[in-house]
Amino acid sequence: MIFLYQVVHFILFTSVSGECVTQLLKDTCFEGGDITTVFTPSAKYCQVVCTYHPRCLLFTFTAESPSEDPTRWFTCVLKDSVTETLPRVNRTAAISGYSFKQCSHQISACNKDIYVDLDMKGINYNSSVAKSAQECQERCTDDVHCHFFTYATRQFPSLEHRNICLLKHTQTGTPTRITKLDKVVSGFSLKSCALSNLACIRDIFPNTVFADSNIDSVMAPDAFVCGRICTHHPGCLFFTFFSQEWPKESQRNLCLLKTSESGLPSTRIKKSKALSGFSLQSCRHSIPVFCHSSFYHDTDFLGEELDIVAAKSHEACQKLCTNAVRCQFFTYTPAQASCNEGKGKCYLKLSSNGSPTKILHGRGGISGYTLRLCKMDNECTTKIKPRIVGGTASVRGEWPWQVTLHTTSPTQRHLCGGSIIGNQWILTAAHCFYGVESPKILRVYSGILNQSEIKEDTSFFGVQEIIIHDQYKMAESGYDIALLKLETTVNYTDSQRPICLPSKGDRNVIYTDCWVTGWGYRKLRDKIQNTLQKAKIPLVTNEECQKRYRGHKITHKMICAGYREGGKDACKGDSGGPLSCKHNEVWHLVGITSWGEGCAQRERPGVYTNVVEYVDWILEKTQAV
């Protein structure tokens, strides 16, 4: 894991429109601007460490060289410059470069490289015999404390140390030194690659304090942000958060990062107004966790002020923060009546660790974070081809997570839609499988625009398993959700890639850009459409939806969408397909097409499975299988 938890809200010293520089400069040293020095096995990994550091903009790495003092080999000097550059000097074996913060491609802490003849130093806390370096790395990945390892091969000179696997950790998550040592290999834990088999506990426990060692503390607006900070701190295994109602004023909004020798809390104490939870570092699912887009009303974030500018709204203030060179978070003060043409004051701020230095309530401000990290690409957040405004037919690559599910019995036909949520997983509706006796008769086609493209020789994914929610009875009763595990993995391309699942912390997000897609009927008595159809539809409150369906119970596990006058909606054949909503430039799978009365009828909105209420179920099933 990369050191420093501040990755959650790191500072960018380059403008959003600044150039992304990926080139490494050989035999070049950046002079000055030193922040700190760490040890990394390669310049490439040094660049990743710089990217995840809250203040690092540039770096200089020293490679192994006869001309350099061996004590300087593998040093990674992290640097900062408010001018975005530093003087360059020639130096043999020096490799310099820039942080990836200003780049739009995927940034990941995952490092699967194995380093031959390198001993990465740290605290050796576990020694055991392993058959191979791969087995040693797997042990490290499945050990809650392990950051990296060193393995002595069968050719190691000392017979008694051959095949020994040393698991190691440090305070920063990076080695304290790296030295040359023949016949050993070293590498990092693959927890950041979502490959750990450790338990993943996503629940946040109210009225609970974990009474264990505090390794650090920061200020956070809610328990969800506290949990994300814990997840990206190399030593944090669990946390306790004191809410704004906590009795002791000086501890309100305090996020305590904790650890224990066993890896679990030793004692749980019942305390009102406290919440506790666990690091998600070991979870085997790639839900984006770096971005926190919520607004905090009647809340002021304190920190170093970068600038004070006029803004019409807190949304505009957040945009100013996102576009500012160094802004991490902001507080917006609404305008007084008839003052400054209705514009309020937008305070752009930063701190040394990326979190507010203090959080105050009751002063009328509205606070939030930069959205810069929301625009970082990930498997499910990669920029998708722009929507085509107007019309109903989609274009190729417009909805790359949409799949068409076919049955081959008695003849092959489109059965339902579905969404790619992982490289072996499709999320769809449970009611699609009424009468389906075996997954062997199912075929999943991805990257398809027209049903007519599907021929006998068109490639497809077989279905290994159908997982239906165990509380499902019928669509109108809820729990209309199912997972398909594919027989083979999906290789992500521009035309087939996953959509992000919503975060439990975003339950209160108001989505305004939502689309339903599918090959279903356009009216009640119709046929399956050849070309993938799309319709932009507004969400409807559950209270309003309940008024339209008095004969049914609209629960919080359902979400409704549609126009009061009708005209646009999902229909037969769209079942199981996505209700996709864009928020902060990221598409989320907000709903699964489930049921409704008729097709696009007046005052009869479509009813969808509310995906955010099933995130834990999805993760439990996809990790367990």
Swiss-Prot record:
Official protein name in the record: Coagulation factor XI
An example Gene Ontology biological process: blood coagulation
Consequence of changing residue 302 to A: Reduces dimerization. Abolishes dimerization
Record's function text: Factor XI triggers the middle phase of the intrinsic pathway of blood coagulation by activating factor IX.
Catalysed reactions, as listed in the record: Selective cleavage of Arg-|-Ala and Arg-|-Val bonds in factor IX to form factor IXa
Organism: Homo sapiens
Compartments in which it is found: Secreted
Coiled coil: none
Any one GO MF annotation of this record: identical protein binding
Effect of mutating residue 43 to T: In FA11D; dominant-negative mutation that results in severely decreased protein secretion
GO cellular component assignments: extracellular exosome; extracellular region; extracellular space; membrane; plasma membrane
Pathology linked to this chain's protein: Factor XI deficiency: A hemorrhagic disease characterized by reduced levels and activity of factor XI resulting in moderate bleeding symptoms, usually occurring after trauma or surgery. Patients usually do not present spontaneous bleeding but women can present with menorrhagia. Hemorrhages are usually moderate.
Glycosylation sites: 90, 126, 163, 450, 491
Domain Peptidase S1, residue spans: 388-623
